[in-house]
């Protein structure tokens, strides 16, 4: 256990595919840690539960494979956690978003009706997903209470990752042109699912995987070698660049008035650094580890890491 500036770093070894998240059941005042261990070629997954001292408290077995990954991390909303269960490729591929209620241990599967779900977000009882098939990109909005589905589609470019902030859902779009791949950020009204505007981000084949927003700004990474984290003013829709000291910025997590940014190649699992960035001043401090860092979560002054040994 290693302590730096009151941040305690706890590592969890990835066995097959493991993703960590936090939840807070109603019957317990303390947060619990869930570790999803999933197999890609079998309909089999386990969720292991730990308390805040990393003592195992239980597990839940699921007959669904390929649940979540370092690319599509689960989202916790109070005592529920949402994730994409992709299923077994070419055998039992799924078109759903899964909800696990940690108070009842019941699972709900919301049928989106589109194959190859790429990314998702959840806000105010609505689930948003993206997918691309047969040259058409689709943004889907699914109401959890009524089952009503709305879709927005385009035949130019590929929709990627997305993030809900305020009254809008922001969707990454990549378009291949003669001068190369251009990344855009679409601003779409969450109620009507109509596109408000499209903002050019950069020329890069790297996609924006991770987002984070506060009341004023949207932050997103692009896994680039230019050591840049993007910041967009939510009122002005103006994008600026925050310079980092390491390549491959990925996951963005808030800590007090600063941001943790992981640095990792998500495909290879290689990357041993995390930045602590002050977005107001642009100053950052880099923490380097002896192991690779593939994913992390913060909770109550602790930084929890999952890693791959290569």
Tell where the protein language model's regions lie, with residue ranges.
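N-terminal Sec-pathway targeting helices
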Residues: 1-13
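An edge-strand/N-cap motif at the start of beta-rich repeat modules
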Residues: 23-63
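Residue position within the beta-strands of beta-propeller blades
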Residues: 37-38, 83, 129, 171, ...
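Structural motif
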Residues: 43-48, 90-98, 135-140, 178-186, ...
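A short beta-strand motif characteristic of beta-propeller blades
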Residues: 57-65, 104-111, 147-154, 194-201, ...
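Repeated scaffold domains used in trafficking and secretory/extracellular systems
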Residues: 67-76, 113-123, 156-166, 203-213, ...
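Solenoidal tandem-repeat scaffolds enriched in leucines and small polar residues
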Residues: 152-230
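Conserved small/polar residues in nucleotide/adenosyl-binding loops
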Residues: 308-310
